[in-house]
Amino acid sequence: TEGISVAICEQTGDPATSKGPVTREVVRIITPGTLTEEALLDAQKESLICAVFERGGDYGLAVMEVSSGRFEVLQTSHLDVLKSELARLGPAELLLPQDAQIALQLEEFKGIKHRPVWEFDESESNQKLKDQFGVQDLSAFDCSDQPVAICAAGCVLAYVGETHRRQLPHLQRLRRIRNEDTIIIDPTSRRNLELVHNLLGGREHTLLSVLDQTKTPMGGRRLARWLTQPLRDSIEIESRLAAVATLQQHSTFEPLRAMLAQAGDIERIVARIALQTARPRDLARLRDTLALLPELSEVMTTVIIPEAPSLLNTLADRTRAQPVLADELQRAIETTPPVVIREGGVIKAGYDETLDELKSISEDAAAFLVKLETEEKTRTGLSSLKVGYNRVHGYFIELSKVQAQEAPITYIRRQTLKNA
């Protein structure tokens, strides 16, 4: 159901030391705009959370895609520009200050949530952003003249931090949306043009459905974003078209597409790893995608020629192999790991000696206990020594009354029986 939030609680106390009920805490709040789980996300669609703040006739907008680490801001003095941006973005959640008058003007948008006014405080927001990015000021992000947008960004950052209950290391930069570089399409025109959604809200018979020949989820989402935000600059448009034409005419075009079809959704996998919510198969997909990079890089180098478009040369330069990480994952992760880590069988044998020993104990506990009993008998010289188990004490070592006095000082007496 849209708009529902779910709190996840986990046991954080130790039952062995807790007096009374074991301590439990909320470790995550899942909301529509802060999803990162693969099963809850549409691979072809962005999942966005936005915040809007109004002050002195200026409107500040902040946009975050938690599942990829994208973080953007916009400031405008025109309400229609703000509405056009929100219509383009289609956020799953829209954060507004409590009792804000602007709520009446934005009631057409879904997912509105009211947040405390202090979360939009400019000074607090500035500090939160500087702490997040590890900088002394925000001038490097070209946002110094966007104070109202910074207020909105501070609210989004606080909200996402509150719901995820952890640091957000994959948020590494703040980007300024420059709508003067793109064509602004009003909500009505956008709906009637059926760029990415048809009039019924589906994707069939849209411009995107006709043009989308992408091979990766990341490419599909990027294409949709480009279609909803058309460029104004003819030079940049020609640069994109020239890059596409060069690739299409190159002999490596089809092999390149075949390789990309094998790639995982790296953008979202990396975000889940940063948020410590990745599952074993995320690591397997990352491993398999990294394994493609050497060949992918080799193919791209054949495209780098003096007359190639600069955009293509930049892309080729960024397609680099990561041998250290690829080798680490290849040695560590099983070929086909389970869906969830609690099922075991994630780490390959031979990767970690201590883990191998623990797995051996887990898989053959009876043999381990016999071995332990034999070793302890030999070490202590106590022939009556036995290893046993009960529900009260768990595993224990039992000695006869005669030999109990000879027990090593490292043994701790738990109970005295009739003859032991």
Where do the PLM segments sit?
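Cytochrome P450 core scaffold surrounding the K-helix E-X-X-R motif
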Residues: K401-T410
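Active-site proximal loops enriched in glycine and acidic residues that flank catalytic Cys/His/Asp
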Residues: Q98, Y389, K401
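Flexible, glycine/threonine-enriched loop-and-boundary segments that flank and lead into catalytic domains
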Residues: A367-V387
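Charged catalytic and DNA/RNA-contacting regions of genome-maintenance
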Residues: T1-Q249, E254, A261-A274, A278-T374
